[in-house]
Each structure stands twice: as C-alpha cells, then as structure tokens.
C-alpha cells in the first residue's frame, strides 16, 4: 500500500511514537535497512512536532532540515491540514533520540509551495514547504545547516546518497525506543525507470513521476512513514548537499524506490523567501 503521512498523523488518531518509558531499551534499528546515526553526522536534521490530543505531548510527525538559522525545509504534505496554524507546531533540533531532553522551537510561519497538489496515489507536484522559527538558532557542531544545490545540478542515476529519519523500520512497524535517528544509503534511480515501476504497480498510463520528483532506494533500503519531510543528501565535492525531501512511496523497502521532491526544482522558490548561497 502507499504510505502517506496523512494516514498516520496524530490529528487523525494514527500511530505516532510518544515519549519513551525510561525503563525501555531496544537495540533494533531502522529507517528501513538502516543503522543508528553517530553524533553530529547530520546536524541539520530536525523533528517536526504536533501536540497530540491523546498523549498530551509534542509528538513527532515529520522530519525536516535546517537550511538557514531561522528556516526549516520540509514536505508540504506534512503541514497540509486545512486550518493548520504555525502556533500548533514545534521543531526540535540537534537531537539523536526523540524526546531526549526536548528543547522545542516555536514556529511562526508556514509557507507551502503554491503548486502543491495531492492525487489519489500520492502527490502530483511541489511537495515542499518552509517553516520559519521564532528566532535564529545559534549554530554549533550539533546544530548546523545543510547546503542546497544549484538549480543546474544533475544527480545521476546510480549515485549513492543518504536518507535519515525517525520513521517506521518496516510497514506498520514503528521505530522502537529509544527512538534513535536512523540513516540508510540509497541509490538514485532515474525518473524514466522509476516512472515505469510506478505505472505498472499503480496501473496508470499517465506519467506518475514528474520532473520535479526524484527517486531513490532499493529493496530493503528505503524511507518510510514518519520520515516524510526529511532530507536526502549526497556527498558532493566534500560537501553534503540536500537533493531531495522525503515525499511518498509504495510500501517500505520493497523493490520500488521512494519518491522525493527534487530540491533543484525549487531552489529558486526557496531563495524568494530565504537569502541563501547555493551549493555546487
């Protein structure tokens, strides 16, 4: 089945990790086929939180990345709920384990891409959004920025990149306590090949994978529910560059790549709101 964040978000009563019992300790690892992240490897990774009515806690709903001391890049579908206000969200930065000494940042503005649109099988286009924090963050080894690509950067099929998050470790299998951030290496899959896979599985004749989408992953190596909005990064000339934003997929870790918003398609839009220096 398709994994769509809106099916698991706390305001719909879905399954979301909550604050761990201090007595629980599990060593199982995930994203899908992933490993625990060493400290300070991905200092731009953030957790987007929503105040769950049932738990009374700020629950993790999506990932995101810090691209400016006061701005977070995430997926539009993470913040697509009609009437959702910035004041109902929080962002946690510099954390490897969810809910471990939370110091949540207030969100003051949500900017969804105006072309964002949902279809029955996923998202047609522009699954990208910006969140403005209440105040600029002080950068450090634990909290830092990821570089964005230039709009002309070409990410070749077969290139190995990394996706990170606190999402499910398999279909309907949440990341267990202590909710340690996961990473997995995934190969880039060309849009034509990716589109053929999805046309077949979804029985669609129309184009499924648009030009502003990017595919990555292989059997047993994938992002999953609750990873949405998180970064797909590639090592480029000794610099980590964010090339994708986790968007949607069919199952988790099957022999189908995950689908990401292609960051190069939206760098110019991002610059309209945030003054940034492009990467390679």
Curated annotation (Swiss-Prot):
Disulfide bonds join 62-78, 161-234, 194-215, 224-252. N-glycosylated. It comes from the Eukaryota. Residues 1-15 form the signal peptide. Gene3D superfamilies: Trypsin-like serine proteases. The keyword Signal applies. CDD domains: Tryp_SPc. It is an enzyme of class 3 (hydrolase). This is Mastin.
